[in-house]
Amino acid sequence: MKICVVGAGYVGLTLSAALASIGHDMICTDKDVKKIGQLKKGVIPFYEPGLSDAILRCGNLSFSSEVKSSMEECPVIFIAVGTPPRSDGSADTKALQSVIGDLSEAIRSYKTIITKSTVPPGTNENIAKQLIASGVSKNLFNIVSNPEFLREGNALYDMLHPDKTVIGVQEEDHVSAAIVKSIYKHIDTPFIVTSLAGAELIKYANNFFLAAKISFINEMARICEAYQSDISDISRAIGLDPRIGKHFLQAGIGYGGSCFPKDLQALQFAAQEKNTETFLLRAVQHINDTQLGLYIKKIQSFFETLQGKKAAVLGISFKPNTDDIRNSQAVRLMERLAELGCDVHAYDPEAVLPEHLRQHVTQHSQAFDAIEESDFLFLATEWSEFLAFDWKKAADIMKGRLVIDGRNVLKKELIEACGLICTGVGRP
C-alpha cells in the first residue's frame, strides 16, 4: 500500500521505517527542507537505537519536503506532527492546523486520514468538520485516530510488536477500521476499535496511569524514609501482584520527557474545559514537581554550603537510550545546583546540554573527566554504562565521598566498599 506520513519527527520516522519494513511503499514528508535533506543522506536528527539502520535498509522509503504533492499521491495519510504544550497547559495544534490546510487542497480522490499525533478529545471530529467547511466532500475522506504508545529507546520494537493497536472511527464510518487493520496485517497485535474521542482519551489515560504509578512509588519512598524501610523491597513485593504489575515502580527523581508532563497538562486542561475536577491528576503532577527538592535537601544535609562545590552529574537525557532532554529531571537538577552555586560538570553518552545551561554547566566527553575532583556525584539517568561503573576508580579521583543515586539502581554495598557514601530515596 502507498502511504504518506506527514511529520519527520520521532513518531513519523519510526512509523515510516516500521511500515516500510513490512512491505508498504512509504513517503515521509516534512516542511523542514534541511531535515529532509539530511534524511535523504541517511542522517537521523535524533538518537534512537536501531532506527538509523532500519531507515538505511528500506529501499521503499523516500523523503520529501513537498507535503501537498506527497499527500496527493497516497490513498492513506498518517499525521504525526508535534502538539507541544502552550503556557496554559493546553495542546498547541498549530502544526496540525497547517496539515489540515494542506489536506484541504490535496484531497482529490478518496483518502483515509489517520492521526498518530496525541491530541485532545474532540480534535479529530473537528478535523473532519474543518475539511468539510473548506469545501472537501465528506465522501472523499474518513478520519481515524490511531495513537502511538512508543517508548523512547525502544520505539522501533514497540511499533512492530505493540501490546495493542487502537483504532478510533466516526460512528458512520464502516470502512476505515478494516483499512487500518490491513495496514498492520503483518504485525501481531490486538485491535481496540472505538470512537474518535475514545481513542484520543485512551492515549491520555495510558500516560496518566503510568505517571501515576511513578508518583505513587515516589510518595511511598518518602514514607519509607520516615520509617527507615527500603522502597525496593516494597516495589518488588507489590509488583508481584498481577493486578499491579512490576513496571514503573522504580522510585527516583521523577518522570520527564516529551509525553508524560505534556499529556497530563493537556488532559487536565481538557477536563477543566468540561468543568470536571481532577484531584488525582493534580496530585500526580504535584508529587513529581516536588520530588527533586527532596534530593536537593539530601545533598544540602551533607554540606554547610553548596557554594563552590563541584557537582558531577551522570546523565542529561530524561531516560536512557535516547538523546531527548525535553522535561529532563537531570536538566532541572543541574539548573538547581547551578543556582545554589555549584560548579556543575556533566556527562551523557548521547545527550547534549540545552543551550541555556552551557554557560553554567561543563559537559565532558568522558564520565571520569566529569567526576575528577568532584565533591559529590549524582546519578541522574540510568544508562547501562553507569550500572557497570568502576567505583574504585571513581573513589580514587573524587575529592568528596558522596554518591547520590537518583534512580535507585546502584548497588550500595559495592559502592560503599570502595570508601564512598551512597544514598538514594526511600532506602536506609
UniProtKB/Swiss-Prot annotation:
Class of enzymatic activity (EC top level): oxidoreductase
EC number in record: 1.1.1.22
Signal peptide per UniProt: 1-23
A biological process term (GO) from this entry: polysaccharide biosynthetic process
Keywords linked to the UniProt accession: Cell wall biogenesis/degradation, NAD, Oxidoreductase, Signal
Catalytic activity: UDP-alpha-D-glucose + 2 NAD(+) + H2O = UDP-alpha-D-glucuronate + 2 NADH + 3 H(+)
Family as reported in the entry's similarity comment: Belongs to the UDP-glucose/GDP-mannose dehydrogenase family.
Role description: Catalyzes the conversion of UDP-glucose into UDP-glucuronate, one of the precursors of teichuronic acid.
The protein's name: Putative UDP-glucose 6-dehydrogenase YtcA
Organism name: Bacillus subtilis (strain 168)
